[in-house]
Amino acid sequence: QSFADVMKAEGLKETSIRIYLTLIKVILNYARKMNYVTYLVHPFVLFKMPISNIRELDLSVDELKRIRDVKLFKSVHIMARDIFMLTYYLGGINLRDLMEYDFTKGNCMRYIRHKTRNSKKNENEIAFTIQPEAQAIIDRYISENGKLVFGKYKSYEKVYSLVFRHIGKVAGLAGINR
């Protein structure tokens, strides 16, 4: 417990302390399992892990509709909202997968997630029909090669930055303040 108190006194946040202590506990348990060390009393027997703060990240249907319907005037806000809503309409698609997809393949979307593409597990293809709400947004940004182009924001990093810099402002304009 005193080690956790020292870390807290040095300015570490609860989440960092949890991560460090969890890693130490894993190492100690492994060492005991491999008979590298023995304990009369396990070092963590009386220790209580710091509780992690739970942030509410989900939006209600009403809040989502307010984001969709809010009147926006700046093009960066409109674009950030469009990308946000498109990822929602496409089942939570990862931004990287969204930007790599060729939308000239028809109204049935099929892809393998970039994140799991090279994993040793089975490559699970994701397939679903593109709904009209999503198609309307796609039609605004589709290029000749079938990829989506968001104005001057061409790379994944630039588009990611655009969305995360402006979606909070869009939510605020929609009356969502949390």
Show which residues each predicted segment covers.
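Hydrophobic (often cysteine-bearing) scaffold residues that line and stabilize catalytic clefts
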Residues: 16-23, 79-80, 159, 163
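N-terminal DNA-binding recognition helix of tyrosine site-specific recombinases/integrases
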Residues: 5, 9-43, 91-93
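Conserved tyrosine-mediated DNA breakage-rejoining catalytic core shared by Y-recombinases
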Residues: 45-46, 99-140
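Short, basic (Lys/Arg/His-rich) helix/loop patches that form interaction surfaces
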Residues: 69, 74-75, 164-178
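Basic, Lys/Arg- and aromatic-enriched nucleic-acid-binding interface segment
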Residues: 14, 39-95, 99
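Feature representing long, continuous alpha-helical segments
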Residues: 65, 88, 96, 132, ...
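Major-groove DNA-contacting interfaces characterized by cationic-aromatic clusters
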Residues: 52, 135-166, 172
